[in-house]
Amino acid sequence: MTALENKCAIKMENITKRFGSVVANNAINMELREGEILSLLGENGSGKTTLMNMLSGIYFPDEGQIYIHDKPVTIASPKDAFDLGIGMIHQHFKLVDLFTATENIILGLEGKLDLNNARKKVKDICDRYGFDIDPDMKIYDMSVSQKQTLEIVKVLYRGADILILDEPTAVLTPQETDKLFAVMRNMKADGKSLIIITHKLHEVLDVSDRVAVLRKGEYIGDVMTKDANQQSLTDMMVGHSVTLNINRPEPINVTPRLKLDGLTVFDELGVKRLDNVSFTINAGEVLGVAGVAGSGQRELLE
């Protein structure tokens, strides 16, 4: 059965959320189907995270009704969301650095806890979906990618069959992103339903089945990913045609203003932070420096 033929895992009817005089979400009607990866797109401030925070129990809607598997529900707290099988992986991780992966996963659970059984269950989840996590590794020894992976394993351990990932690739390398998407496809194949919030259009086209778009707190519509491209999605996000290919004029004065040649930097612990970095900035030029967190941008500017 395809996602098109599946029932709704989530149905949101006329969901409205206000913060004082600001309407963050206005009468939103949106669905997530069972066994589907849905990308939620929108500019900054369009209301994406606010909408998802109502599904995860952080906010409560001022108006409207949420249905989970066709049943009307009230989600007044994160516990309500967990009890309904909804798990949200936030941009900022909620892990205790001094604890192991397994200890973080069972932290806060009620009843008698068996660490050995928990460790085995964590390993089973990792093997099932393709996660690469050592159940006994301390959080302070983990990379950013491993911490994010652990957050996903944590919600699966607690029984989530609906997962919401808020900007999951913002801190990942391209290789780590590919690995995450492979895991997401494994979860989808196992019947999980997923929502991914992202700004990266090429990732939307790569991993999702369907795309829903918000603009200024309003639900604009949805489109099957196979029928979309970066241009059409951008137009939906901003409300008018946008030129993605920008041709900038060449600077008239190409006099070098700053030149780096083979710059290498070690931090106070002797760790190499920059290795043989070279570039030239000319007059009238804007140079962009890109990289995931910890790639050396701060050391370069300092």
What are the language-model segments listed below?
Residues T2-E302:
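Glycine-rich phosphate-binding loops of nucleotide-dependent enzymes
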